[in-house]
């Protein structure tokens, strides 16, 4: 499935009953969140609010509200097929030369996909059909949602922020929330280790006192949106990865106010700059943890141009206690992570981020253990191999006879195979999400690893327990007479 733009995707969703148009007037202030939250929890469709109260622009919510829609956005039929996306990323992260003709033939599909990586630059684009600049720039014309009662102000949640560092050829795409503070002002809330923040830091060092160009695309095609939240290798741009997902090159157009390139098919583009040193207090906001976060200072984004389609759609979401859209994305992207981790650690059998763990804060790993201390090596690997897991607070490692996605199995392993003193690893003073108010210092906290594997010689001096297993011959005999026993139908019928 290939989508040229967001509207192609919406057309398909509507054909498959995965999009609901809402003609009743609904307020972006709290009401849309209430409707979207109820719909997502019921596994319902994407929502297109066609008549937001007080605005002329439709609002799209709950676009990736089910794992299947995430898979569809990546060009796959179902979530299990996302393992293939992960295998492609693992190949791109550490490409190996073909070992022979047969291996070359097997890898031809991957090499063919790589041809779609370069972007296609356009002179004009749908996202620039209407242009607002100077005094005509007014962010308050956009139906930006206020999601929770104690939120500080309306909040842009699905903006693809485009940046480029002074020493980098490729652009970075990241999704950072942006608080509305004026008709042409937003607060750019990015964490210090994220790509956009790193680009800004490098710019300030290379060009002291100069304005940092920035652009935000709203309503891009699904491959580009999902490319911005997928663990692509640092050497690969999100635009290139989107081209791989889509099967065609990503079309971009140069901004009117800078050399940055934005998705040509985007619904809305905000162009402007960050003035070094201009900061503002951001928050509080209800977040994916289920709590309001504390107020902190972040850079101010001054918008100089708004470009958009003639009949633009505003793409939005809300975040709150799981399940929410980030949690659903986490469930789907979990399948992408598995092959990437297995490429580096072949002993890993499965990797699971439970959605109730707020997307990434707790991970369960199952593995084929091969030596004493092996589980601890895998723990450290999870924390360090991919940048996405530097904020993961808890890593539970189990043997491959445990189902990582079944809490009954995992809790059984923890309670029967762990000694708390021996098998708990605590690491202090590590990077932690700023939103994690449980950490003693903002941005710095501890991590816990739980080794719930069977212990090998050297890890214990005791005889280790053997799991109880049924006699297969007895099981087969009882299977043969089970219906005749009629235990669950009061003896009435077979």
Curated annotation (Swiss-Prot):
Active site per the UniProt annotation: 287
Keywords, sorted A to Z: Cell membrane, Decarboxylase, Flavoprotein, FMN, Lyase, Manganese, Membrane, Metal-binding, Ubiquinone biosynthesis
Cofactor(s) this protein requires: prenylated FMN; Mn(2+)
Membrane topology term: Peripheral membrane protein
Pathway(s) of this molecule: Cofactor biosynthesis; ubiquinone biosynthesis
Protein residues bound to prenylated FMN: 175-177, 189-191, 194-195
EC nos: 4.1.1.98
UniProt entry tagged with the keyword DNA-binding: no
Textual note on the cofactor: Binds 1 prenylated FMN per subunit.
Pfam families linked: UbiD, UbiD_C, UbiD_N
GO terms of biological process kind: ubiquinone biosynthetic process
Sample GO molecular function, one term: 3-octaprenyl-4-hydroxybenzoate carboxy-lyase activity
SUPFAM superfamilies linked to this entry: FMN-binding split barrel (SSF50475), UbiD C-terminal domain-like (SSF143968)
Binding site for Mn(2+): 172, 238
Catalysed reaction, written as an equation: a 4-hydroxy-3-(all-trans-polyprenyl)benzoate + H(+) = a 2-(all-trans-polyprenyl)phenol + CO2
Top-level taxon in the UniProt lineage: Bacteria
InterPro entries hit by this protein: UbiD, UbiD-like_C, UbiD-like_N, UbiD_bacteria, UbiD_Rift_dom
Record-level GO cellular component terms: cytosol; plasma membrane
Recorded family membership: Belongs to the UbiD family.
Subunit record text: Homohexamer.
Function recorded in the entry: Catalyzes the decarboxylation of 3-octaprenyl-4-hydroxy benzoate to 2-octaprenylphenol, an intermediate step in ubiquinone biosynthesis.
Protein name as catalogued: 3-octaprenyl-4-hydroxybenzoate carboxy-lyase
Organism: Citrobacter koseri (strain ATCC BAA-895 / CDC 4225-83 / SGSC4696)
């Amino acid at each position: 499935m290939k989508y040229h733009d967001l509207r192609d995707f919406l057309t398909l969703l509507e054909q498959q009953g995965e999009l609901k148009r809402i003609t009743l007037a609904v307020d972006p202030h709290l009401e849309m969140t209430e409707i979207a939250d109820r719909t997502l929890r019921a596994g319902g469709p994407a929502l297109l609010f066609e008549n937001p109260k007080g605005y002329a622009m439709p609002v799209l919510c709950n676009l990736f509200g089910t794992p299947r829609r995430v898979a569809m956005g990546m060009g796959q039929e179902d979530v299990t097929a996302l393992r293939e996306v992960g295998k492609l990323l693992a190949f791109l992260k550490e490409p190996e030369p073909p070992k022979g003709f047969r291996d070359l033939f097997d890898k031809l599909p991957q090499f063919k996909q790589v041809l779609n990586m370069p972007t296609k630059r356009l002179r004009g684009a749908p996202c620039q059909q209407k242009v607002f600049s100077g005094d005509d720039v007014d962010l308050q014309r956009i139906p930006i949602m206020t999601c929770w009662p104690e939120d500080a102000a309306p909040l842009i949640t699905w903006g693809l922020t485009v940046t480029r560092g002074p020493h980098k050829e490729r652009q970075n795409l990241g999704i950072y929330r942006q608080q509305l503070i004026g008709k042409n002002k937003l607060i750019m809330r990015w964490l210090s280790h994220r790509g956009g923040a790193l680009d800004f830091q490098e710019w300030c060092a290379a060009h002291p006192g100069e304005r940092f160009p920035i652009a935000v695309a709203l309503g891009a095609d699904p491959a580009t949106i999902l490319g911005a939240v997928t663990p692509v290798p640092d050497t690969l741009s999100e635009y290139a990865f989107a081209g791989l997902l889509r099967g065609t090159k990503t079309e971009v157009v140069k901004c009117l106010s800078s050399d940055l390139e934005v998705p040509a098919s985007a619904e809305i583009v905000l162009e402007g700059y960050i003035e070094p040193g201009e900061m503002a207090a951001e928050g509080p906001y209800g977040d994916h943890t289920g709590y309001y976060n504390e107020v902190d200072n972040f850079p101010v984004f001054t918008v100089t141009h708004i470009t958009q389609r003639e009949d633009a759609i505003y793409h939005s979401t809300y975040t709150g206690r799981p399940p929410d859209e980030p949690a659903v994305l986490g469930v789907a992207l979990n399948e992408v992570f598995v092959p990437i981790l297995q490429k580096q650690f072949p002993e890993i059998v499965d990797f699971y981020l439970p959605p109730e763990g707020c997307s990434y804060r707790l991970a369960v790993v199952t593995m084929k253990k091969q030596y004493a201390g092996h589980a601890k090596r895998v723990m450290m690997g999870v924390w360090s191999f991919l940048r996405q897991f530097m904020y993961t607070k808890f890593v539970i490692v189990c043997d491959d006879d445990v189902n990582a996605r079944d809490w009954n199995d995992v809790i059984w392993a923890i309670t029967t195979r762990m000694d708390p003193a021996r098998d708990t690893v605590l690491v202090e003073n590590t990077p932690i999400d700023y939103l994690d108010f449980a950490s003693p210092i903002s941005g710095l906290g501890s991590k816990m690893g739980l080794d719930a594997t069977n212990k090998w010689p050297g890890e214990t001096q005791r005889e280790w327990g053997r799991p109880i297993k049924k006699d297969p011959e007895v099981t087969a005999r009882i299977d043969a007479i089970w219906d005749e026993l009629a235990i669950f139908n009061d003896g009435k019928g077979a």
